[in-house]
A protein has these predicted regions:
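Amphipathic alpha-helical segments that form well-ordered structural scaffolds
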Residues: 24, 28-31, 168-179, 230
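C-terminal helix/juxtamembrane-tail motif
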Residues: 230-243
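Acidic carboxylate-rich catalytic motifs and surrounding loops in phosphoryl-/glycosyl-chemistry enzymes
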Residues: 39-45, 189-191, 242-243
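GST-like domain detector, emphasizing the conserved glutathione-binding G-site
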Residues: 1-138
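GST-like fold's C-terminal all-alpha helical module
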Residues: 108-217, 223
Length: 243
């Protein structure tokens, strides 16, 4: 079989893989038992190297494919996998709703928490751009802050007060923790494709260093680290944390 190359961000700020969407695809690769290698791309090169201008993407032989959901669906179909089998219609509806909550709402709160705060952004710049002198890092950091702030304003999170963002985060985290307290995985006794989205995002929030207001909030939910432990075990001791 052709070796799959998964392209992602480097390790940074306590996380083995900075992008939760790359973590999500890596979990699918492990679940499906596929052979793969991870190629870490400098954030400054992602736009020019990636077919879609962002991570993740994969290469198999001469073909490339982008978008985490498209990659997972392709790998599952190619492998005759069971990632989408055995789910009831109600489970699919709930799984999709929680995936959207995580990837299209909580994600933006996480981006704001990591990139807008001075401490957090400085740690990211140092971690990701350590090969550049400090003045260049500071310029890139300031430009990145402006770009991310603009994206978050378009999305809506960036137009809220800190207090409003906090309330939104509480709602998202409580919804996830309420669901995860009912059963070992998101939808039942075993892992499903929706766990990859939720576990990837929660790990990216919880294990990020330095801590920020969102990671502090997430730590109030004891079920999150327990759940991530179960996901890791199920995928053969998957490591979320940077060595």
């Amino acid at each position: 079989p052709t070796l799959i190359t998964l392209y992602g961000m480097p390790s940074a700020c306590g996380l083995k893989q900075l992008s939760p969407f790359v973590v999500k695809v890596e979990m699918a690769l492990l679940y499906l038992g596929l052979e793969y290698e991870v190629e870490h791309i400098s954030p400054l090169k992602v736009r020019s190297l990636s077919p879609a201008g962002k991570v993740p993407w994969i290469r198999m032989g001469k073909s490339t494919l982008s978008e985490s959901d498209s990659i997972i669906a392709f790998l599952n179909g190619n492998q005759d996998g069971d990632l989408f089998d055995g789910l009831t219609n109600d489970q699919r509806v709930l799984g999709l709703a929680l995936k959207r909550l995580t990837e299209d709402h909580l994600y933006w709160l996480m981006v704001w928490a990591k990139w807008i705060s001075e401490t957090s952004r400085a740690a990211l710049a140092e971690s990701l751009l350590d090969q550049y002198p400090r003045p260049i890092r500071m310029v890139i950091s300031a430009v990145t802050k402006r770009q991310i702030s603009a994206m978050c304003k378009t999305q809506g999170i960036g137009l809220m007060s800190a207090d409003e963002r906090g309330k939104e985060a509480v709602k998202d985290l409580t919804a996830l923790s309420d669901q995860l307290e009912k059963m070992p995985f998101l939808l039942g006794p075993d892992i499903t494709v929706y766990d990859f989205s939720v576990a990837a995002m929660l790990s990216s929030i919880l294990f990020f260093k330095p801590t920020n207001w969102l990671s502090d909030m997430a730590k109030n939910h004891e079920v999150f680290p327990e759940y991530l432990g179960r996901v890791s075990d199920r995928l053969g001791d998957y490591e979320f944390i940077q060595d």
